[in-house]
Amino acid sequence: MDKKNFDTIDAALEDIRQGKLVIVIDDEDREDEGDFIGAADKVTNEMVNFITREARGLLCVAVTMDRAKELQLDPMVQRNTSQHETNFTVSVDAIAEGVTTGISVYDRAMTIKMLGDLSSTADDFSRPGHIFPLRAMDGGVLRRVGHTEAAVDLARLAGCSPTGLLCEILNDDGSMARLPQLIKLKAKFGLKLITIKELVAYQMQRNKLVQRAVESRLPTIYGEFRLIAYESFTDQHNHMAFVKGDVTTDEPVLVRVHSQCATGDTFASLRCDCGNQLASALTMIEKEGRGVLIYLMQEGRGIGLINKLKAYNLQDQGYDTVEANEKLGFKADLRDYGIGAQILKDLGVRKMKLMTNNPKKVVGLEGYGLEIVERVPLEMASNPMNQFYLDTKRDKLGHMIGCSFGPENFHIEKTATKP
């Protein structure tokens, strides 16, 4: 991306503060889309009319988790299978003087404005309606690199109510507007254009999701490591980093981001390959002489120990690991890598050789400005108890198991330059 086409975050915040819209583009490996984003409490009829005419996408309002609870904005569906984990709630219309069907420009502007008004209550809205609220993850773009979180972060940083309106931008023919079309749109209407990647960098300079709590020397059967414990500001979990050698140089560092698996890591369960991957990663780091293993408390791909054991029971009935999660009302993978990225940043890691079979983890970390120069496979020998599990990870979750590890299967070019 040519940096001259983009504006600074501060310039975008000033426009939002003045009641203007900005264009925000996300990662090309995620949705590669541009959205109009503005502050909900600054909305006008003219703004809504402009969005419906020039954007043509779905007009939504991003709210915080706490605000969604206050307004009783329940999830649109019990089982969210959205490809990008978009947290839609039930749609709403404002109950206010002058609001009729909910679809007119005036009606939608009033609904958006009332969603951005912190004095509004649940009784001020009818359900369903014509505006679609989205629940932003706590921690904003530092937890999830999406337009929903960007809208809330930008509104808050601009000094407005932490509620943002957003709408995908489509071309005249109905296709998604990509960067070349968004640059033309920026010039035509004099709008600021920013990237979520730059917003992440901006937030990382000002906010932290974790802080170092304590560091200790830890001799293990794999070798000796520095064990650093981190406290999280967004939940009650403590995360760990196993560090070997100097990881702050420009030389790429061997890195493993490992999510907790008590059954596999501690009790050597044959249902998964987690324990073997953990042991292999620590062994490889010791052999390399330098590296980092981040241990995140995200048991059961984020669903927790109790639900993971419930999923095991379903798997014994014939469900695969993805189907079991979904039957329990969860997505196949609820992990987020924002905290892991912040820990790596705190440790001074700049470039990494990432030990993973999971392409989602690659994209998840790259979204936070970390440069991954190589993917190092961690394929473990299967056993009769986990063969079906490994096949499902390959076939349904896209894990690169039993495939070529050439550069055609792993794109690293885009991390070389920041927009």
UniProtKB/Swiss-Prot annotation:
Its EC number is 4.1.99.12, 3.5.4.25. GTP binds at residues 256-260, 277, 299-301, 321, 356, 361. Pathway: Cofactor biosynthesis; riboflavin biosynthesis; 2-hydroxy-3-oxobutyl phosphate from D-ribulose 5-phosphate: step 1/1; Cofactor biosynthesis; riboflavin biosynthesis; 5-amino-6-(D-ribitylamino)uracil from GTP: step 1/4. Mg(2+) 1 binds at residue 31. It catalyses: D-ribulose 5-phosphate = (2S)-2-hydroxy-3-oxobutyl phosphate + formate + H(+); GTP + 4 H2O = 2,5-diamino-6-hydroxy-4-(5-phosphoribosylamino)-pyrimidine + formate + 2 phosphate + 3 H(+). The active site is at residues 333, 335. D-ribulose 5-phosphate binds at residues 30-31, 35, 144-148, 168. Keywords: GTP-binding, Hydrolase, Lyase, Magnesium, Manganese, Metal-binding, Multifunctional enzyme, Nucleotide-binding, Riboflavin biosynthesis, Zinc. Binds 2 divalent metal cations per subunit. Magnesium or manganese. Binds 1 zinc ion per subunit. Its cofactor is Mg(2+); Mn(2+); Zn(2+). Mg(2+) 2 binds at residues 31, 147. Residues 1-205 are annotated as: DHBP synthase. Disulfide bonds: none annotated. Gene3D superfamilies: DHBP synthase, GTP cyclohydrolase II. In the N-terminal section; belongs to the DHBP synthase family. Catalyzes the conversion of D-ribulose 5-phosphate to formate and 3,4-dihydroxy-2-butanone 4-phosphate. Catalyzes the conversion of GTP to 2,5-diamino-6-ribosylamino-4(3H)-pyrimidinone 5'-phosphate (DARP), formate and pyrophosphate. This is Riboflavin biosynthesis protein RibBA. The lineage of its organism: Bacteria, Pseudomonadati, Chlorobiota, Chlorobiia, Chlorobiales. The gene is ribBA.
